[in-house]
Amino acid sequence: MHGRQFETWSCQPPGALSETALQAWLQAMPAGVLRLKGVVQTGAGQWSELQFAGRSGRLRAASAPAPAQQQVPAIVAIGLAGQLPVAALQALVAGAAGVRVAGRPA
């Protein structure tokens, strides 16, 4: 039943994301995102945990995954069905990675 009420979006960033960009991102989360979490690489050998719920978010240092875990960076967002701003989330991740999205400055 919940599957019809909610929609999810996820991505696996291909490289390190800017901590500064992620902090700004958490302060200006697009409307429609109810919950977001993930573990991402923010520098060479540096990992961060990303959390957003309600109207607040945080970024904190995380332990690097053990090689046996083969963990990849990932972000997951949840919103109400039909209201999750997928294009905005994709643009935010691309901007944090320093990638230019067509029609938008990086």
Give a label for each model feature.
Residues 77:
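Flexible loop/N-cap segments at domain edges
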